[in-house]
Curated annotation (Swiss-Prot):
Associates with 90S and pre-40S pre-ribosomal particles. Belongs to the RRP36 family. Residues 1-11, 115-127 have a biased composition (Basic residues). Residues 96-106 have a biased composition (Acidic residues). This is rRNA biogenesis protein RRP36. It is found in: Nucleus, Nucleolus. Residues 1-169, 215-254 are annotated as: Disordered. Component of the 90S pre-ribosome involved in the maturation of rRNAs. Required for early cleavages of the pre-RNAs in the 40S ribosomal subunit maturation pathway.
Amino acid sequence: MLKSTARKRKAPSTGPSGLQRRVRARKEEVDSEIDESSNPSENEGSERSSDEDEEDEEPKASRSSKSNLDMASISFGALAKAQASMPKRSKKESAESEESEIDDSGSDSGNESKYRKRGGLAKRSSKHAPTEMSSKRPVSRKREIFQVPKVEARDPRFDPAVNSGGSNFDEAKAKKAYAFLDEYRDSEMAELRMEIRKTKDAAQKERLQTLLQSMQNRKKAAKRKDDEKRILEEHRQREKDLVQQGKQPFYLKKSEQKKRLLTEQFKGMKKKQVNKVIERKRKKVAAKEKMELDQLQRR
């Protein structure tokens, strides 16, 4: 089939129509020569241009016919081999060519390409690569001319003016200024005792007793702390006086401080109360030792 089509395409078109065309063209040339002889100055330029056009058209027509004949004679297998032998275009090159085609096509496509160049659209070098986006952001039109100082919340728990960690903090002054809180706590404890006596609900009574016990323990701990500070202050004042007399200073150890605190604590107690406190202390120490022994046995 391919050979027959090639032969058909190769065969030149010879017929009466072709001869008539040639005859007509020659007749027209004779007429034009007669016109030129009548008016030679006007038709010289037109003759030259027509001759040149005919000369250009003849080789173009011959070239196109030759190329068509050559392509028709080539088999599909040869075309496939030629295409396979040609270097393949990468995706990047094809994308760039597409972008260039888009840039060339009209004003709308030009605006789109500009938008892409600015980084408005997300790009990826390949389908496995992460999406690349521009980190540039438009600057806000709002401008801060006068900087307003930031209002920060003041928490007294972490305020150096309130805590003892501050350099200018005076604990004695603070305690004197907030002495009314101790009186307020004492009145609260008295109200709790009255409620415990009046209430008949066992659960409510137990809850009020635990609250009263915690308040009493806090008061005792504060009193013990005050006693420790008072003993240390007395000892320091005594040592200052002795140093002025020319003696060596003596610094109290922690164990010595505890002994003096216990003696101060037992001074205002009766013998029965002292025995009770000592027994409670002994039980506490025994329970602690027992717990430590159990932990050692488990290991």
